[in-house]
Amino acid sequence: MTTGLHEFNLASRRAEEAAARRFQAVQWLKSVVGQLGIPNQPSEKEFISCLRNGMILCNAINKIHPGAVSKVVENYSYLNGEYQLPPAYQYFENVRNFLVALETLRLPGFEASDLEKDNLESGSVTKVVDCILGLKAYHECKLPSNGNGLYKHVKTPTFQLSATKIHPTLSASKTSRHLDMSSVRERNDCTDGESDKLKGIAKLFADHIFSSKENIDENLVSLENGSENSRANFEKILSRFPELQSVFKNLLSEGTLKPSDLKSMPLEELPVHEEDQSSRSLSHKTKCNHKRLLKTQEKELAVLKNLFIKTKQDFKEFQVYLQRDLMELGNQMQEMSSAAQGYYKVVEENRKLYNMVQDLKGNIRVYCRVRPIFNSEMDGVIDYIGKDGSLFVLDPSKPYKDARKTFQFNQVFGPTATQDDVFRETQPLIRSVMDGYNVCIFAYGQTGSGKTYTMSGPPGRSATEMGINYLALSDLFLICDRRKDMMTYEIYVQMVEIYNEQVRDLLAENSSYIRTCSSDDDGLSLPDATMHSVNSTKDVLQLMEAGEVNRAVSSTSMNNRSSRSHSIFMVHVRGKDTSGGTLRSCLHLVDLAGSERVDKSEVTGDRLKEAQYINKSLSCLGDVISALAQKNSHIPYRNSKLTLLLQDSLGGQAKTLMFAHLSPEEDSFGETISTLKFAQRVSTVELGAARAHKETREVMHLKEQIENLKRALGTEEWNNVSNGSKEIKSPFSRPIATTERTPPRLRRLSIENCSSTKANLEDRRGIKSPLASRRAQILSLEGPMSCKNEENGKGDPTMEVHQLKNPRSPLSSYQNRAVKVDGRTSIPQLQLLQTPVKGASRNDIQMISVDSKTNGKGSHIRKSLRTIGKLINGSEKRKENIPADPRSPLGVANNFSHIKSPDTSNAKTMRRQSLTGVMPPGQERSRRSSIGGKPIENGKKDHVFTPFRLNKFNN
């Protein structure tokens, strides 16, 4: 324990003494040269790094002895604070010149290798410090004597020892006799064995000195200052150790040094003349070492130079190769880029062609979306999702080779798909709404599979989590802004839900129920629902939030926020272009309630009732899809309110898309397979090509003409009814009741006559009902148009009504009165079958002549004429159910044999007139009368054909 503490104290004192000597050397160099750029108490590495380039040493020796170093290389500044390895020539030249100057001044030096940073051996730093302190002593000795003073450098006795070195500085004159261990070491430097012995002596001497516990520091300081005689003090120290005297005496007498035989010897017997000899030998050896080191460094420098030249050439070759490879790589990248562009172009064209084929076939597009697994520890049933729309699922109850099931859809979105990815695929379909097409997108799947997330987004959604409802409206507003120079759009929205088979308005203040589900001509499936106009996405977001608040939502064991109703978000678009054409379309965004199993959802009470209604409506939807897939003649749309509202979308003339949502957990495998099979069945449904709801300006003009025609016909027939009812009161003008036994001859009439006239026989009691206007409308459209009237009808078309009025006297004749009615309408040239009409008057025979000019396209008016044809067929059916009036002289030809002519006074009068040959003017009579009188001819213009007989009148 005592020995270890002694060694620690000894090492500490030695380190302090070495630091003190370095401090003295640095302070002296700063006073001579200037700032060195190192701390006042530097470490050994910092001290050596500062002196490595030799500039400081050369400048210091030139200060002491001007001209000692003739050339100093000064291209490296030691004041910059960066101690980097200087160039080799500067290192060797400055250090070599400094060592040569030291040799000239006969001052102790050191080896150039002592300045190597990586070669700090024991005692190397001590040599450099001793050299600088020697320069200091030489400088101080030279100043008082004006350059002629005596100088004696005293080195540290243990400068060769790293672990036991001490650094006292001793100053004395050269003539003084003292123990100089450096002289002994230099004298015996020629033999390595003696050097080892000297080291042992010095170590033993140092141990004895420090073990004496004397205050040597004060003595050393006094010796350094020159206040005391160093020789006397040293002799005093040695006198206390008689064994050292015997050791030195034996050493000098025998010529050999052994640590075990050390004896004391007097200091006077130490040789002094050998000091110069050892110094010269050391200087010669140092010079030889410097030359050898310089040659070695020159050889290494030449090798490095050759290596640098070779490396430079290799670098140039490598640069050429690199440029060539870069050019080849650029060409390959360009080819790959061109190929990739061509590939994507072909893919886009194929996609457009595929969508075109789908539009022509009218198939329902089916997209499948798989939500992420909520519990990461559970295994999923989704095995593979392909980019081509393929989907592989695994049945957990079967082995792997038999468990895989394959499905194919238009597109499949994996768990990592975002809302924007889903909307990007549906965007072309949604944008077709702005072109006049009806579009329906509905989400189908098990409860908790993510339907509401896809359509509306999660509660408290961010901008990146918005559903298709919001993104679709935002895209429609963007298109409206782009087309504002060509089209003017108006967008309206409705939001309803089907809750327990009742339609409820979600945007109404009281969320009232809508009892009727009808479809009007304006394209509204629910005209009673509240409709709101929207102009920005902000309006849409507010309405969506209001509707979601009113929607029926509840919590079950399968889903914390389960939708208990079918939500339908309807977007109505009305557009008008600059030419006056219009379009209308509707976008249905349907969020179906999820199918659920009651045993898994664990619902009771009202929730159970809701689940039953939900499953029933989804079952009806499945029945409709199956009927459409099998192309049945009857589609059960009316089995559910859901299918009734989706009738326009599923029944054709619309573009339809279904999202099939899947839950990937194993416990939901049954519902997943059911959803996939339903989606696969939906994908086989062909609805036919969708039809755009556009109307050009010409079509609108033709429809307006049809409406004007209908109004004109109604006004004209009402006038005819009014005039006919006023002229039935004369008792003298009742026509003869005759029978017609042959059916009408339409073909013969069309050949013989060029005019289109009709006979409207009214009831003898007069017309008492406005239904005659419809009969007149029917009769006005029966028969061909008159060629003569078509030639003469260049002015305004008119209708002429000829009536036979009662004469004021028996001898007066009937006069024809023509009532012209403005009917600027176009009557098509159609020949319809003649229908027998009841209700002809016994007093008057009404003749109607229609003269109008036909213009416009018949194809655009055909729809209106079909409507009129339905009225005709309807009137025929009604007439078949009404029994014939026995008082009417008119009837069907086949029933004439069962009808007897009334024996009235008027008939007798007519018979007498026929016998006498006197007939009232204008009185019509049949050629097939029972008397056989000659009928009156009217060759002027009126040839009237009735469904029962052909009469000719003469004026």
Curated annotation (Swiss-Prot):
Region Disordered, annotated ranges: 878-942
Recorded coiled-coil stretches: 692-719
Alphabetical GO CC annotations of the entry are: microtubule; microtubule cytoskeleton
Residues holding ATP: 445-452
Q: Identify the residues that the record assigns to the Kinesin motor domain, covering every copy.
A: 363-685
Q: Does the keyword Nucleotide-binding apply?
A: yes
Does this entry carry the keyword Mitochondrion? no
Q: Which InterPro entries match?
A: CH_dom, CH_dom_sf, Kinesin-like_fam, Kinesin_motor_dom, Kinesin_motor_dom_sf, P-loop_NTPase
Q: Which UniProt keywords apply?
A: ATP-binding, Coiled coil, Microtubule, Motor protein, Nucleotide-binding
- Biased composition regions of type Polar residues, renumbered to the chain: 894-916
The record's annotation in PROSITE patterns points to:
CH, KINESIN_MOTOR_2
The family classification in the record reads: Belongs to the TRAFAC class myosin-kinesin ATPase superfamily. Kinesin family. KIN-14 subfamily.
**What protein name does the entry list?**
Kinesin-like protein KIN-14L
| Lineage, broadest ranks | Eukaryota, Viridiplantae, Streptophyta, Embryophyta, Tracheophyta
